[in-house]
Structures are given as C-alpha cells and as structure tokens.
UniProtKB/Swiss-Prot annotation:
InterPro entries, per database record: 4pyrrol_Mease, 4pyrrol_Methylase_sf, 4pyrrole_Mease_sub1, 4pyrrole_Mease_sub2, Dphthn_synthase
Protein name from the UniProt record: Diphthine synthase
Pathway(s) per entry: Protein modification; peptidyl-diphthamide biosynthesis
GO molecular function, one term: diphthine synthase activity
Organism taxonomic ancestry: Archaea, Methanobacteriati, Methanobacteriota, Stenosarchaea group, Methanomicrobia
Catalytic activity as recorded in UniProt: 2-[(3S)-amino-3-carboxypropyl]-L-histidyl-[translation elongation factor 2] + 3 S-adenosyl-L-methionine = diphthine-[translation elongation factor 2] + 3 S-adenosyl-L-homocysteine + 3 H(+)
Organism annotation: Methanosarcina acetivorans (strain ATCC 35395 / DSM 2834 / JCM 12185 / C2A)
UniProt function note: S-adenosyl-L-methionine-dependent methyltransferase that catalyzes the trimethylation of the amino group of the modified target histidine residue in translation elongation factor 2 (EF-2), to form an intermediate called diphthine. The three successive methylation reactions represent the second step of diphthamide biosynthesis.
Family stated for the protein in its record: Belongs to the diphthine synthase family.
Highest taxon above the source species: Archaea
GO biological process, one term: protein histidyl modification to diphthamide
Class of the enzyme per the UniProt entry, highest EC level: transferase
Length: 266
C-alpha cells in the first residue's frame, strides 16, 4: 500500500495525528520537497518525531524512475509531501502510476497554502480564479533573457472576470527560492513590455512563512510592494481582482494595505 501524507505548511508539528500514526506504522517512509518544502524543520527533526528513517527523493526519483514504488506492492509505504498531498499534479500522476501497478493508495490530507492564503488575507476562497506559477527567467540559445508572460496573461484573464490570482513562486535547486519581490519585478517587466495596464494599477499581496508563528502578510500596489522586505522564504503572491468591501477592509486591517483600496470595492 502507498499512503500519501500531506505534512502541512511550516514544520514537523503540522502533520495531523492521523498522518503521524500512519508514518509510524509504515514499513518505509519516503519524502519529496522539490514541489514544496517545510522551512521550519529538517529531515533530522522529522525523523526524531516520527521515530522513522525518512528517505529523500529527487525530482527524477518521483517523476522519471520511481523504482522505489515497487516496494509498495508488498510493503506499507508512506510518501510525504509539503502542504496537502494532492495539490501537485506530480503527485496525482504518481498515484495513477501506482494504481496501474495494482498498488492500493490512500490519502491523508494536510493544511494547504490555498486555504491558508484565504485565512491570512481575508480574501474569499470562492473568488479565486486559475492559479499561476512564475518560473525564473532563462537564457535562450541566442543569449536573450526569456521571461514567461503566462502568469501575466492569467492575471489579466482573472481580472477581467473579477477574480483573484494565486501565484506560486519557483523553487530551483541552483537559484533557490524565488521571493515575492522578484516575482513582482518580473510581472512589472512584462507590464513595461506590453503596456496593458494590468500590473500598473494592481494591488498585490505577499505572504511569507505561512503556517509559522509569525507569518508576514503585506498588501500594497505592486510598484510599492516590490520593495517591501518579506524576510525568509517561502513566499507566495496574490493579485486580487475586484474586491468585496469586506475583503478590502481585511487587506487594510490584516495586511496593512493602503486605505485607498476601500474606495475601489464593488
């Protein structure tokens, strides 16, 4: 059997009691932290709490050559992930592969950044549209620096519908954790190129270290927010669409947003 266990948002103590019990009962415990990771802990602390050895998997181990998956045919295997265990399509794909191999799968959910963002910002969860991810720029074969415009397009589409956009930020083994500041700079660079006024007038909300004792939540106009010090990772970014008056009040009072947004509500 293969049990997918979501570990929550920040440290080893965010795991549910049901999840902890499943880890302790497992024959083998694997974890991947390239789609998301817990910044408030490390494998040693996790192993101490669980009383189990945690085997760390690379992207290749999970997506290309999951040889370890065969062990779940006759053993009780736990697979640990940050956040909720089925938010990433990588994990859905892994579950489907396991089922095709005749391996029984089971899910134990964990706290998700999607629900945490709504709670921390006061933005209503049913008013979110399609989410986006901002990757690091890369250099083309001709030496040009390529910035993805897909996140900008997603924000534009959601904005036209009055919906909020949650933006996940890149985690790269060489470049590290993308900050909300860098993400805003990239969006504003695309704005500069295209001149459509999407980010020029947009309010944005940055969240850092959700799930910790002292998360940072700050709202402001994008041009100003890019200079705010969010501190250590992980960061996530939200670009709200049309704000309900309660959402605007929440951003002002809970995220130190500019009072002017109270005048721009529906």
């Amino acid at each position: 059997m293969l049990t997918f266990i979501g570990l929550g948002l920040f440290d080893e103590y965010d795991i549910s009691l049901k999840g902890l019990e499943a880890v302790r009962e497992a024959d083998l415990v694997y974890a991947e932290f390239y789609t998301s990771c817990l910044m408030g802990t490390n494998p040693e602390k996790m192993e101490k709490l669980y009383g189990k050895k945690v085997h760390l998997l690379s992207r290749e181990d999970v997506e290309q050559q999951p040889d370890w998956l065969d062990k779940a045919k006759d053993k009780n295997v736990a697979f640990l992930t940050g956040g909720d265990t089925m938010v990433s399509t990588t994990h859905v794909d892994l579950r489907l592969r396991a089922e095709k191999l005749g391996i029984e799968t089971h899910l134990i959910h964990g706290a998700s950044i999607a629900s945490a963002v709504s709670g921390l910002t006061g933005l209503q969860n049913y008013r979110f549209g399609k989410s986006a991810s901002i990757p690091y720029p890369y250099e083309s074969r001709r030496g040009a620096i390529i910035i993805s415009e897909t996140p900008y397009d997603t924000i534009k589409q959601n904005s036209e519908l009055g919906l909020h956009t949650m933006i996940f930020l890149d985690i790269d083994k060489d470049k590290g954790y993308m900050t909300a500041n860098h993400a805003l700079e990239l969006l504003l660079e695309v704005e500069k190129r295209r001149g459509e006024g999407i980010m020029e007038r947009a309010v944005a909300v940055g969240i850092a270290r959700a799930g910790s004792e002292k998360p940072v939540v700050k709202a402001d106009y994008a041009e100003s927010l890019k200079d705010f010090d969010f501190g250590n990772p992980l960061h996530i970014l939200v670009v709200p669409g049309k704000l309900h008056f309660l959402e605007a009040e929440a951003l002002v009072k809970l995220a130190a947003g500019p009072g002017k947004i109270m005048e721009e509500t529906e």
